[in-house]
Amino acid sequence: MDWQNRFSVLNLSSHDPLPELMLTHLTGWGAITLVGTDKKAYLQGQVTCNVVSLQEQQVTFGAHCDAKGKVWSVFRLFHHHDGYAMFQPQSAMEVELRELKKYAIFSKVTIAESSDIALGVMGSQADAWIDTVSETTGDVRRIAGGTAVRMSPQRWLLLVNAEQAEQYVNAWQGLHVEQSLWTRMDIEEAVPVVTQTAQNEHIPQALNVQAVDGISFTKGCYTGQETVARAKYRGINKRAMYIVKGNLSAPLSQDEPVVLERAVGENWRSAGALLTYYRFTDSIAIGLIVLPNDLEHDVELRLAAQPDTRWHIQPLPYSLSEE
């Protein structure tokens, strides 16, 4: 069997525990790489995070904005091979690559889409498994064929060449699962996300990038910095990203935006589209959405296409306060 066909859907209800060890092929994600003598200085002038202070064993969130502070991409940045990798949703990469390259002609830097394979290791035994394939500690580790990166306490990314990916998949002793479980964990961890449909719509703080330490307010200038700084120091940001959960009366559309409405008195008003979502087998779904940050947390929501459904805001795993 071709290794890429070994991953199957794992049907879970909203009450089922997650298996202890799972591997998935992250075809919906990819990485942009930067190599060359000017890679650090160039990227430092483009993104919200501090590239200069990023150590070999560290990973950081970051965002890349236009001049008005609207986000092209939210990514995880880490050292990979002889340069940097920016891990992000595949659908955002075409536009992000174009925008990131815009001023690169003046610098000694090569920016490209990585040909490496992205695999995701998930579950309570993920750390123990990573220890068997790496000889170092830390959140970013060099491994055979590439790099292992800790995404969260029970998740690791493997960004490796195709030959090594095949070896890992074929030797895997846990479950081979389809990538939607990675999306589920992103949602439960409220990982900031920008796919193609949400590019150039929000400033970083509306996606909670500051709450996951993806914005440095002490670094030098970068594209969109003025808006990002004003949002912090003048309080102009009125939006935040939230986890929402609710019931379904029919499958969600794969092709159209999944729009939520919020109750306003006895009426309903559009609240926006889900950035991403995951559906359980018991007609429950969870998602991420950008909403006004002064909304009452007990506000009633519903799917615009399924008005008999009810959705609610869930607690975030981190604080949005600026303290």
Curated annotation (Swiss-Prot):
Tell me yes or no: is Cytoplasm among this UniProt entry's keywords. yes
Q: Does the keyword tRNA processing apply?
A: yes
Q: Sorted alphabetically, which SUPFAM superfamilies does this protein's record hold?
A: Aminomethyltransferase beta-barrel domain, Folate-binding domain
Name the UniProt key words of this record, in alphabetical order.
Cytoplasm, Folate-binding, tRNA processing
Chain positions recorded as folate binding sites: 29, 182
Stored InterPro entries:
GcvT/YgfZ_C (IPR029043), tRNA-modifying_YgfZ (IPR023758), YgfZ/GcvT (IPR045179), YgfZ/GcvT_CS (IPR017703), YgfZ_barrel (IPR048451)
Please, which domain of life does this record's source organism belong to? Bacteria
Disulphide bonds in the chain: none
Q: Which Pfam families match?
A: YgfZ_barrel
Which GO molecular-function terms appear in the entry? folic acid binding
Q: Where in the cell is it found?
A: Cytoplasm
Q: Which GO terms describe its cellular component?
A: cytoplasm
User: What does this protein do, in the record's words?
Assistant: Folate-binding protein involved in regulating the level of ATP-DnaA and in the modification of some tRNAs. It is probably a key factor in regulatory networks that act via tRNA modification, such as initiation of chromosomal replication.
Q: Which family does it belong to?
A: Belongs to the tRNA-modifying YgfZ family.
Q: What is this protein called?
A: tRNA-modifying protein YgfZ
